[in-house]
């Protein structure tokens, strides 16, 4: 019953002396791929299958477990900075909350594939014949010893080395198309224990002891060590197995494919991919594939054709009509014969077995019904053969044989490639900041926002900038706040531009980090006059000069292409820059000193702003010193009474107050440049809420590109929070954005624009529907590897939900 005879590294010998080499196929991301990309993957897998002209292939999809505690502990190693103790405590509390919600482990589907190694024919010589006879005799002795003593298995070193050479060639061949990892004894141990119902152990933490004793020309292992992972009481019933361990019991049932009654059209036939999303419980699948060479396959097909023709002739001679089944079968067999004859491809005898387990019989019945219904919808009829449970159970062992021939399906490589083996939805990193879980797979999603600039293998971007887009109320500000908060806890530094003054109460709502929160509230009080003057706020004089030009041209509407006015304004700003007393009020004085009609005109225009509402924040006489410090871990800059224009308002329609408000945003955002140029070893975030307000004006667009480019060099990420992906879709900016978050949108043009921004098919109706149907707190995420998926943002803690919630409070009923 137990087929394994010997294990060495990733090689497994069975009782028939067949040798298989096993690998883990590193899963590839399959979500949101276009049809064209899916066909590329399909073709690669078809070639992987078709390159073996003979032998057997054994593919397993196993629902392993990964430890939440282990991931969280790894995340703690990433924490640095002044808030380290708070962060460690927060992660520990987070761990306990997650464990209480979903248990110690979460399901993690892994894909294993084994190839039978075929011995190449040796030249017949006296030496090889002697060696063969000696090996046969030795094998006989070993078998006698094993039968009599039943305590050890001996494997000649020559035999091991011969197959190891073959395995190296095979590995070199298959790794050109997909990423593979060789299995080891721990993998096999886990696999066998898993099949026998053992759970609760994380895959990474599992250890399997298989001691070996080296002799002069052979290696011994104990039979007991080999079968130890199978220790458990197995009771077989007609349609299920009961597996009992010391501390637990489980019930297992096996399905196999009875018939495929319709076409499985690709793409949409990826069973391995869809069942990960469909089932809330773990399901394992085994594909035992025997390769039938082209000549043998053609011969089988032609024999079948003769049988069908005989049936047709018999019906004709007896005067009855040939049944439609026979006619259809004749058409199919003709097509298959032509196809095999032209392509010279092999055929494959497939034994497809599904394993369903549950803690009790009622739950097992419910799960079995769910699995059966899922396959029914795909035109695949499953059957649970009575009395064959143990036999089907054995098909999951590495190097196992096909148990039963009654349910074999003859398929081509196209069919096997279309099942989506190895396809999964992957998002984010293995460790880092926990932001929520994948809506499709339920797996936790972790991010490391500072990782992009490290040039990690597999990433498709080295941009630290991020974009949060979506219509009002979808959750973009909440998600943005959560990521900034945890980035600060993990050792980063942040400055948040808060135009709507939504974060003013963070010191009260986030008491554990209150000492590191610095809220700069720039009111229109007279004592704040001149605090946002470019010459006051910028350390670098050159930066101050260019910002002064930007602000004054923005307010007055003077274009740099205006040959009369611009040179006059430029000259006045240059004169102030070179003087000892620097401030925007001196620009007015300098223009009046010029005393030409144009200069007086510009001076009067600028002067008209100086006492308008909160504009005095921008104008100083040079006596004001910079009072804005950004030395804390979390800095929030607010300007009271800002009035931002509506999203659809054109620049020409801006009112004076809106013009001034956007000018303030441009000044503060430019001030962030100084923050970006601080300590390069610390990851920094410049968070621009309502970014659309200045991305829609020329000066703001130039500034955003400047911030992003400076950020990449100085390990700083610029976070754009805006309502439309169109604001960040311009080529110069789009290519410099790494992480992308898109929240719900209902406008079809906006949806298409967002999908295009993500680089996925904008005309695909399924993609459009996914974005339109997102619930509050759900977003489409594109990670640093270009993978796209849907995430449910999960703050875990009630206090964070309260702190980051920007919705207006619900009015309580008056009693």
Protein language model annotation of sequence segments:
Residues 13, 28, 35, 44-49, ...:
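Glycine-rich phosphate-binding loop of nucleotide-binding enzymes
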Residues 53-56, 109, 490-492, 517, ...:
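Short glycine-/polar-rich loops that comprise or flank the Walker A/P-loop
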Residues 125, 439-445, 450-452, 457-470, ...:
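Charge-patterned, long linear interaction tracts outside catalytic cores
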Residues 35-53, 276-279, 292-299, 380-381, ...:
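P-loop NTPase motor domains
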Residues 100-101, 540-586, 729-815:
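P-loop NTPase motor core of the ASCE superfamily
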Residues 312-314, 450-474, 479-484, 497-504, ...:
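Conserved P-loop NTPase motor cores
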Residues 1-410, 420-421:
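Extended, folded cores of ATP/NTP-driven motor/assembly subunits in large transport
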